Amino acid sequence: MINGAHIIVYSKDAEADKAFIKNVLKFKYVDVHEGWLIFKLPPSEVAVHPSDDNDRHDFYLMTDDLDAEMAGLKRAGAVCEDVSQQAWGRVTRIKLPGGGTLGLYEPRHERP
């Protein structure tokens, strides 16, 4: 029986991104070996979208109030892209210190 999911975020500055997830997003974590942090995620869901690119996967965090979440992130020093309106929700991307981005959205769809 599958009982969870493990997501890997690749980074050009893993230490900075780990500090961001720990200190700005405030995710709980365990140090499994010499600074290798594994973060606890909120409940999750998986969606399958049609695409010609079979090896692409996106990772989004979800919130019930995108404006409030973005305001809190900005107060903590995070930079968020402009919000876009999609059929499935309001979407932004959080800029990570290592140069990558992390999706964040307020869903319009029913959640399982």
Stretch-by-stretch model annotation:
Residues D17-K22, L73, G99:
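Conserved active-site tyrosine of GNAT-family acetyltransferases
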Residues M1-K18, E45, H57-F59, R108-P112:
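N-terminal beta-strand motif that seeds the catalytic metal site of vicinal oxygen chelate
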Residues L25-V32, A78-V83:
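Short secondary-structure junctions
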Residues F27-H57, L61, T101-R108:
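Conserved short beta-strand elements that form part of the metal-binding/catalytic scaffold
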Residues G4-K12, K40, S51-P112:
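Vicinal oxygen chelate
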